[in-house]
Protein backbone atom coordinates (compact mmCIF):
# COMPACT_ATOMS: atom_id res chain seq x y z
CA UNK A 1 0.00 0.00 0.00
CA UNK A 2 2.83 2.41 0.89
CA UNK A 3 4.33 1.73 -2.54
CA UNK A 4 1.09 2.77 -4.22
CA UNK A 5 0.88 5.95 -2.11
CA UNK A 6 4.49 6.81 -2.89
CA UNK A 7 3.67 6.71 -6.60
CA UNK A 8 0.68 9.01 -6.22
CA UNK A 9 2.49 11.47 -3.93
CA UNK A 10 5.96 11.17 -5.53
CA UNK A 11 7.62 10.48 -2.15
CA UNK A 12 10.02 7.77 -0.95
CA UNK A 13 10.37 5.07 -2.16
CA UNK A 14 9.06 6.41 -5.48
CA UNK A 15 12.56 7.00 -6.84
CA UNK A 16 13.47 3.38 -6.11
CA UNK A 17 10.36 2.11 -7.85
CA UNK A 18 10.75 4.48 -10.79
CA UNK A 19 12.67 2.14 -13.08
CA UNK A 20 10.24 -0.75 -12.79
CA UNK A 21 7.20 1.54 -12.95
CA UNK A 22 8.37 3.09 -16.20
CA UNK A 23 8.88 -0.30 -17.78
CA UNK A 24 5.57 -1.67 -16.59
CA UNK A 25 3.67 1.40 -17.77
CA UNK A 26 5.18 1.36 -21.24
CA UNK A 27 4.72 -2.38 -21.70
CA UNK A 28 1.13 -2.31 -20.40
CA UNK A 29 0.01 0.31 -22.88
CA UNK A 30 1.38 -1.37 -25.97
CA UNK A 31 0.44 -4.93 -25.07
CA UNK A 32 -3.16 -4.23 -24.11
CA UNK A 33 -3.81 -2.27 -27.28
CA UNK A 34 -2.31 -4.86 -29.59
CA UNK A 35 -2.96 -8.18 -27.88
CA UNK A 36 -5.92 -9.12 -30.08
CA UNK A 37 -3.81 -8.74 -33.23
CA UNK A 38 -0.28 -9.84 -32.36
CA UNK A 39 0.75 -13.31 -31.24
CA UNK A 40 3.50 -13.66 -28.63
CA UNK A 41 5.88 -15.53 -30.92
CA UNK A 42 5.88 -12.85 -33.65
CA UNK A 43 3.65 -14.78 -36.07
CA UNK A 44 0.12 -13.75 -37.02
CA UNK A 45 -2.89 -15.34 -38.60
CA UNK A 46 -3.94 -13.18 -41.60
CA UNK A 47 -7.00 -11.05 -40.90
CA UNK A 48 -8.90 -12.36 -43.94
CA UNK A 49 -9.65 -15.91 -45.02
CA UNK A 50 -8.72 -14.91 -48.58
CA UNK A 51 -5.08 -14.60 -47.49
CA UNK A 52 -4.67 -17.62 -45.23
CA UNK A 53 -2.19 -20.08 -46.72
CA UNK A 54 -0.99 -17.80 -49.50
CA UNK A 55 2.81 -17.79 -49.88
CA UNK A 56 5.15 -16.10 -52.32
CA UNK A 57 4.19 -14.56 -55.66
CA UNK A 58 0.42 -14.76 -56.20
CA UNK A 59 -0.12 -12.10 -58.90
CA UNK A 60 2.57 -11.81 -61.57
CA UNK A 61 3.21 -8.66 -63.58
CA UNK A 62 4.43 -9.67 -67.05
CA UNK A 63 4.07 -6.18 -68.49
CA UNK A 64 6.67 -4.59 -66.23
CA UNK A 65 9.47 -6.85 -65.03
CA UNK A 66 11.75 -4.06 -63.78
CA UNK A 67 10.71 -4.52 -60.16
CA UNK A 68 12.81 -5.19 -57.06
CA UNK A 69 11.40 -5.25 -53.54
CA UNK A 70 13.23 -4.85 -50.24
CA UNK A 71 11.53 -5.94 -47.03
CA UNK A 72 12.04 -6.59 -43.34
CA UNK A 73 9.98 -8.94 -41.17
CA UNK A 74 9.11 -9.69 -37.56
CA UNK A 75 11.00 -12.98 -37.16
CA UNK A 76 14.50 -13.61 -38.46
CA UNK A 77 16.46 -10.30 -38.64
CA UNK A 78 17.20 -10.83 -42.33
CA UNK A 79 16.57 -8.00 -44.81
CA UNK A 80 15.72 -9.48 -48.22
CA UNK A 81 15.78 -8.11 -51.74
CA UNK A 82 13.64 -10.00 -54.26
CA UNK A 83 12.98 -9.50 -57.96
CA UNK A 84 9.76 -9.30 -59.96
CA UNK A 85 9.44 -13.11 -59.90
CA UNK A 86 9.82 -13.26 -56.12
CA UNK A 87 13.30 -14.76 -56.36
CA UNK A 88 15.85 -13.81 -53.71
CA UNK A 89 18.53 -11.48 -55.12
CA UNK A 90 20.39 -10.47 -51.96
CA UNK A 91 20.05 -10.51 -48.20
CA UNK A 92 21.56 -8.71 -45.22
CA UNK A 93 21.98 -10.36 -41.81
CA UNK A 94 21.28 -7.60 -39.28
CA UNK A 95 20.85 -9.73 -36.15
CA UNK A 96 21.12 -7.33 -33.16
CA UNK A 97 22.80 -9.56 -30.59
CA UNK A 98 25.30 -10.90 -33.12
CA UNK A 99 26.16 -7.52 -34.63
CA UNK A 100 25.54 -4.88 -31.95
CA UNK A 101 26.44 -4.10 -28.36
CA UNK A 102 23.49 -3.96 -25.98
CA UNK A 103 22.67 -0.32 -25.10
CA UNK A 104 23.46 0.53 -21.48
CA UNK A 105 19.95 1.91 -20.81
CA UNK A 106 18.39 -1.52 -21.32
CA UNK A 107 18.33 -3.03 -17.85
CA UNK A 108 15.82 -5.80 -18.49
CA UNK A 109 16.39 -9.24 -19.93
CA UNK A 110 14.61 -9.01 -23.27
CA UNK A 111 14.50 -11.72 -25.88
CA UNK A 112 16.23 -11.26 -29.20
CA UNK A 113 12.95 -11.98 -30.97
CA UNK A 114 11.44 -8.78 -29.56
CA UNK A 115 14.13 -6.59 -31.19
CA UNK A 116 12.95 -6.21 -34.76
CA UNK A 117 14.21 -4.28 -37.83
CA UNK A 118 11.30 -1.87 -38.19
CA UNK A 119 12.49 0.30 -41.07
CA UNK A 120 15.30 0.04 -43.60
CA UNK A 121 16.88 2.47 -46.04
CA UNK A 122 18.91 1.16 -48.98
CA UNK A 123 21.76 3.17 -50.49
CA UNK A 124 22.73 2.68 -54.18
CA UNK A 125 26.05 1.06 -53.17
CA UNK A 126 24.30 -1.65 -51.12
CA UNK A 127 24.78 -0.06 -47.70
CA UNK A 128 21.68 -0.25 -45.55
CA UNK A 129 20.27 1.65 -42.55
CA UNK A 130 18.22 -0.29 -40.01
CA UNK A 131 15.98 0.99 -37.20
CA UNK A 132 15.71 -1.54 -34.37
CA UNK A 133 12.47 -1.39 -32.43
CA UNK A 134 11.55 -3.40 -29.34
CA UNK A 135 8.01 -4.37 -30.22
CA UNK A 136 5.60 -3.76 -27.31
CA UNK A 137 8.53 -2.33 -25.30
CA UNK A 138 9.38 1.07 -26.79
CA UNK A 139 11.54 1.98 -23.77
CA UNK A 140 13.88 -0.83 -24.91
CA UNK A 141 14.30 0.32 -28.51
CA UNK A 142 17.84 -0.49 -29.62
CA UNK A 143 18.89 2.29 -32.02
CA UNK A 144 20.02 2.71 -35.63
CA UNK A 145 22.78 0.83 -37.44
CA UNK A 146 24.40 1.03 -40.85
CA UNK A 147 25.73 -2.06 -42.64
CA UNK A 148 27.51 -2.57 -45.94
CA UNK A 149 26.27 -4.95 -48.63
CA UNK A 150 28.16 -7.84 -46.97
CA UNK A 151 26.32 -7.27 -43.67
CA UNK A 152 29.43 -5.83 -42.00
CA UNK A 153 28.65 -3.18 -39.40
CA UNK A 154 29.73 0.35 -40.40
CA UNK A 155 28.37 2.17 -37.34
CA UNK A 156 25.79 1.81 -34.58
CA UNK A 157 24.05 4.62 -32.69
CA UNK A 158 22.25 3.31 -29.59
CA UNK A 159 18.99 5.07 -28.81
CA UNK A 160 15.28 4.62 -28.34
CA UNK A 161 14.66 5.18 -32.04
CA UNK A 162 11.56 3.78 -33.67
CA UNK A 163 9.34 3.57 -36.73
CA UNK A 164 10.39 5.15 -40.02
CA UNK A 165 13.45 7.09 -41.11
CA UNK A 166 14.12 9.47 -43.98
CA UNK A 167 17.32 10.67 -45.61
CA UNK A 168 17.73 14.13 -47.15
CA UNK A 169 19.43 14.70 -50.53
CA UNK A 170 22.44 15.96 -48.53
CA UNK A 171 22.68 12.65 -46.65
CA UNK A 172 21.36 13.69 -43.24
CA UNK A 173 19.27 11.03 -41.49
CA UNK A 174 15.96 11.96 -39.85
CA UNK A 175 14.50 9.67 -37.23
CA UNK A 176 12.21 9.54 -34.20
CA UNK A 177 13.24 8.72 -30.64
CA UNK A 178 11.90 8.94 -27.11
CA UNK A 179 12.94 9.35 -23.50
CA UNK A 180 11.12 7.78 -20.58
CA UNK A 181 10.64 10.54 -18.01
CA UNK A 182 9.68 10.39 -14.33
CA UNK A 183 8.85 14.05 -13.71
CA UNK A 184 6.08 16.36 -14.86
CA UNK A 185 6.48 18.39 -18.04
CA UNK A 186 7.52 22.02 -17.56
CA UNK A 187 6.14 23.10 -20.93
CA UNK A 188 3.01 25.33 -21.10
CA UNK A 189 -0.45 23.68 -21.09
CA UNK A 190 0.89 20.27 -19.99
CA UNK A 191 0.31 20.55 -16.25
CA UNK A 192 -2.33 17.81 -16.41
CA UNK A 193 0.11 15.20 -17.78
CA UNK A 194 1.68 13.12 -15.00
CA UNK A 195 4.65 10.75 -15.12
CA UNK A 196 5.79 8.21 -16.00
CA UNK A 197 5.54 9.24 -19.62
CA UNK A 198 7.30 9.28 -22.97
CA UNK A 199 8.83 12.47 -24.31
CA UNK A 200 9.14 12.26 -28.07
CA UNK A 201 11.93 13.70 -30.18
CA UNK A 202 13.03 14.21 -33.76
CA UNK A 203 16.70 13.36 -34.21
CA UNK A 204 18.95 14.55 -37.01
CA UNK A 205 21.98 12.31 -37.54
CA UNK A 206 24.82 12.79 -40.00
CA UNK A 207 25.94 10.13 -42.45
CA UNK A 208 28.57 8.92 -39.96
CA UNK A 209 25.94 8.17 -37.32
CA UNK A 210 26.65 11.22 -35.13
CA UNK A 211 23.73 13.03 -33.51
CA UNK A 212 23.51 16.62 -34.79
CA UNK A 213 20.27 17.87 -33.27
CA UNK A 214 17.38 16.74 -31.08
CA UNK A 215 13.98 18.45 -31.13
CA UNK A 216 11.28 17.87 -28.51
CA UNK A 217 7.95 17.50 -30.30
CA UNK A 218 5.87 18.37 -27.23
CA UNK A 219 7.98 21.45 -26.52
CA UNK A 220 7.58 22.64 -30.11
CA UNK A 221 3.80 22.20 -29.98
CA UNK A 222 3.49 23.81 -26.53
CA UNK A 223 5.29 26.93 -27.76
CA UNK A 224 3.23 27.19 -30.96
CA UNK A 225 -0.02 28.97 -31.78
CA UNK A 226 -1.72 25.56 -31.73
CA UNK A 227 -0.84 24.82 -28.10
CA UNK A 228 -4.06 25.58 -26.18
CA UNK A 229 -6.37 24.20 -28.86
CA UNK A 230 -4.40 20.98 -29.19
CA UNK A 231 -2.68 20.05 -25.95
CA UNK A 232 -5.85 19.77 -23.87
CA UNK A 233 -6.79 16.80 -26.07
CA UNK A 234 -3.90 14.85 -24.55
CA UNK A 235 -5.85 14.73 -21.32
CA UNK A 236 -8.53 12.67 -23.05
CA UNK A 237 -6.16 10.52 -25.07
CA UNK A 238 -6.26 6.97 -23.74
CA UNK A 239 -2.53 6.52 -24.22
CA UNK A 240 -1.19 5.86 -20.70
CA UNK A 241 2.05 7.79 -21.17
CA UNK A 242 2.37 7.40 -24.95
CA UNK A 243 0.56 10.67 -25.58
CA UNK A 244 1.65 11.32 -29.16
CA UNK A 245 3.07 8.08 -30.61
CA UNK A 246 4.88 9.72 -33.54
CA UNK A 247 5.43 7.18 -36.29
CA UNK A 248 6.63 9.10 -39.36
CA UNK A 249 9.29 11.68 -40.09
CA UNK A 250 9.33 12.81 -43.72
CA UNK A 251 11.77 15.31 -45.22
CA UNK A 252 10.15 17.81 -47.62
CA UNK A 253 12.28 18.14 -50.76
CA UNK A 254 12.59 21.27 -52.90
CA UNK A 255 10.43 19.72 -55.64
CA UNK A 256 7.67 18.89 -53.15
CA UNK A 257 7.83 22.32 -51.50
CA UNK A 258 7.52 24.01 -54.89
CA UNK A 259 4.01 22.50 -55.18
CA UNK A 260 2.80 23.60 -51.73
CA UNK A 261 2.89 27.24 -50.61
CA UNK A 262 2.48 26.28 -46.94
CA UNK A 263 5.68 24.27 -46.59
CA UNK A 264 9.36 24.92 -47.19
CA UNK A 265 12.31 22.77 -48.31
CA UNK A 266 13.68 20.92 -45.29
CA UNK A 267 10.44 20.98 -43.31
CA UNK A 268 9.57 17.73 -41.56
CA UNK A 269 6.15 16.05 -41.66
CA UNK A 270 5.41 14.15 -38.45
CA UNK A 271 2.49 11.76 -37.96
CA UNK A 272 1.12 11.56 -34.38
CA UNK A 273 -0.87 8.36 -34.15
CA UNK A 274 -2.28 8.61 -30.61
CA UNK A 275 -4.09 11.86 -31.42
CA UNK A 276 -4.81 11.29 -35.15
CA UNK A 277 -2.81 14.42 -35.96
CA UNK A 278 -0.22 15.52 -38.50
CA UNK A 279 2.25 18.34 -37.88
CA UNK A 280 4.81 20.10 -40.06
CA UNK A 281 7.86 21.50 -38.26
CA UNK A 282 10.77 23.67 -39.35
CA UNK A 283 13.79 21.86 -37.86
CA UNK A 284 15.95 25.00 -37.98
CA UNK A 285 13.66 27.18 -35.88
CA UNK A 286 11.78 24.29 -34.23
CA UNK A 287 8.54 26.13 -35.02
CA UNK A 288 5.34 24.29 -35.91
CA UNK A 289 4.43 25.47 -39.40
CA UNK A 290 1.14 23.52 -39.66
CA UNK A 291 -0.99 21.18 -37.54
CA UNK A 292 -4.10 19.38 -38.67
CA UNK A 293 -6.58 16.57 -38.22
CA UNK A 294 -8.87 15.03 -40.78
CA UNK A 295 -10.97 12.02 -41.76
CA UNK A 296 -8.23 9.58 -40.72
CA UNK A 297 -7.41 7.70 -37.52
CA UNK A 298 -4.40 5.76 -36.26
CA UNK A 299 -2.48 6.80 -39.37
CA UNK A 300 1.04 5.73 -40.38
CA UNK A 301 3.57 6.63 -43.07
CA UNK A 302 2.57 10.21 -43.82
CA UNK A 303 4.41 11.93 -46.68
CA UNK A 304 4.14 14.81 -49.14
CA UNK A 305 3.45 13.83 -52.74
CA UNK A 306 5.17 15.43 -55.73
CA UNK A 307 1.91 17.38 -56.24
CA UNK A 308 2.27 18.88 -52.75
CA UNK A 309 -0.53 16.84 -51.13
CA UNK A 310 -0.22 15.11 -47.77
CA UNK A 311 -0.60 11.39 -48.45
CA UNK A 312 -0.99 8.86 -45.65
CA UNK A 313 -1.79 5.29 -44.68
CA UNK A 314 -5.11 5.64 -42.86
CA UNK A 315 -5.17 2.54 -40.69
CA UNK A 316 -8.36 3.04 -38.68
CA UNK A 317 -10.42 5.83 -40.27
CA UNK A 318 -12.79 3.25 -41.77
CA UNK A 319 -12.43 0.71 -38.96
CA UNK A 320 -16.17 0.04 -38.77
CA UNK A 321 -16.07 -1.11 -42.37
CA UNK A 322 -12.96 -3.17 -41.58
CA UNK A 323 -10.99 -1.20 -44.12
CA UNK A 324 -7.78 0.77 -44.26
CA UNK A 325 -7.20 3.50 -46.83
CA UNK A 326 -4.44 5.24 -48.70
CA UNK A 327 -5.59 8.84 -48.52
CA UNK A 328 -4.58 12.15 -50.09
CA UNK A 329 -5.23 15.42 -48.23
CA UNK A 330 -4.81 18.99 -49.44
CA UNK A 331 -3.78 21.14 -46.43
CA UNK A 332 -4.69 24.32 -48.32
CA UNK A 333 -8.29 23.40 -49.24
CA UNK A 334 -8.84 20.69 -46.56
CA UNK A 335 -10.22 18.42 -49.28
CA UNK A 336 -9.34 14.73 -49.17
CA UNK A 337 -9.45 11.86 -51.63
CA UNK A 338 -9.27 8.11 -51.03
CA UNK A 339 -6.70 6.64 -53.39
CA UNK A 340 -7.27 3.01 -52.38
CA UNK A 341 -9.40 1.06 -49.90
CA UNK A 342 -9.32 -2.50 -51.23
CA UNK A 343 -11.64 -4.61 -53.35
CA UNK A 344 -14.27 -7.18 -52.50
CA UNK A 345 -12.04 -10.10 -53.47
CA UNK A 346 -8.89 -8.40 -52.12
CA UNK A 347 -9.86 -6.87 -48.75
CA UNK A 348 -7.53 -4.28 -47.28
CA UNK A 349 -7.28 -3.71 -43.53
CA UNK A 350 -4.12 -3.15 -41.50
CA UNK A 351 -4.92 -1.86 -38.00
CA UNK A 352 -1.26 -1.23 -37.12
CA UNK A 353 2.02 -0.37 -38.84
CA UNK A 354 2.13 -0.67 -42.68
CA UNK A 355 3.30 1.71 -45.38
CA UNK A 356 2.99 2.66 -49.05
CA UNK A 357 5.05 4.15 -51.86
CA UNK A 358 3.87 6.48 -54.62
CA UNK A 359 5.21 5.36 -57.99
CA UNK A 360 5.23 6.80 -61.53
CA UNK A 361 2.04 6.59 -63.62
CA UNK A 362 -0.08 6.78 -60.42
CA UNK A 363 0.88 3.29 -59.31
CA UNK A 364 1.05 2.67 -55.54
CA UNK A 365 3.12 0.01 -53.79
CA UNK A 366 1.50 -1.06 -50.49
CA UNK A 367 2.78 -3.05 -47.51
CA UNK A 368 0.10 -4.64 -45.32
CA UNK A 369 1.90 -5.51 -42.10
CA UNK A 370 -0.30 -8.05 -40.35
CA UNK A 371 -1.06 -10.13 -43.43
CA UNK A 372 2.59 -10.38 -44.51
CA UNK A 373 1.45 -8.95 -47.83
CA UNK A 374 3.01 -6.57 -50.36
CA UNK A 375 1.24 -5.53 -53.55
CA UNK A 376 1.14 -2.89 -56.27
CA UNK A 377 -1.92 -1.25 -57.82
CA UNK A 378 -2.19 0.68 -61.08
CA UNK A 379 -4.00 3.95 -61.78
CA UNK A 380 -7.30 2.05 -62.12
CA UNK A 381 -6.74 0.42 -58.67
CA UNK A 382 -6.16 -3.01 -60.19
CA UNK A 383 -3.61 -5.20 -58.43
CA UNK A 384 -0.78 -5.81 -60.88
CA UNK A 385 1.66 -7.58 -58.51
CA UNK A 386 1.20 -9.35 -55.18
CA UNK A 387 3.58 -11.21 -52.86
CA UNK A 388 3.14 -12.87 -49.45
CA UNK A 389 6.38 -13.25 -47.51
CA UNK A 390 7.26 -16.96 -47.09
CA UNK A 391 8.41 -16.81 -43.46
CA UNK A 392 5.97 -19.09 -41.63
CA UNK A 393 5.52 -20.82 -38.30
CA UNK A 394 7.03 -24.31 -38.61
CA UNK A 395 4.11 -25.75 -36.65
CA UNK A 396 1.40 -23.88 -38.52
CA UNK A 397 1.96 -22.72 -42.11
CA UNK A 398 -1.12 -20.50 -41.86
CA UNK A 399 0.69 -18.25 -39.38
CA UNK A 400 2.88 -15.67 -41.12
CA UNK A 401 5.58 -13.27 -40.04
CA UNK A 402 4.59 -9.61 -40.24
CA UNK A 403 6.19 -7.46 -42.90
CA UNK A 404 7.44 -4.08 -41.68
CA UNK A 405 9.30 -2.10 -44.33
CA UNK A 406 8.42 -2.97 -47.91
CA UNK A 407 10.05 -0.80 -50.59
CA UNK A 408 10.03 -1.07 -54.38
CA UNK A 409 12.95 -0.22 -56.67
CA UNK A 410 13.91 -0.33 -60.32
CA UNK A 411 17.26 -1.74 -61.47
CA UNK A 412 18.62 1.76 -62.07
CA UNK A 413 18.03 2.63 -58.40
CA UNK A 414 20.13 -0.27 -57.11
Stretches found by the model and what they are:
Residues 1-414:
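Histidine-/acidic-rich catalytic cores in large beta-rich domains
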Amino acid sequence: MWGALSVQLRIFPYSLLERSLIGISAIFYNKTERESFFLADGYNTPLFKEYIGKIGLTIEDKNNTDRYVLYSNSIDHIIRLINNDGQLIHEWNVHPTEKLQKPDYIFENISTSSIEPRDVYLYPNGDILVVYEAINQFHNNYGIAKFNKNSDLIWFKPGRNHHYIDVSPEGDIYTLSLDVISKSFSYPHLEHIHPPSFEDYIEIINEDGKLQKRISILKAISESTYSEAFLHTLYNANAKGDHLHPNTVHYVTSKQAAQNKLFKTGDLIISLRSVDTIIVIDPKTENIRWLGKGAWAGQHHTILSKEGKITLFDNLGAKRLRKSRIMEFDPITSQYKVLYSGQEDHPFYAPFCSMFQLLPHKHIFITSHHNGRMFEIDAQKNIVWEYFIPIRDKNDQNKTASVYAGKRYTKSQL
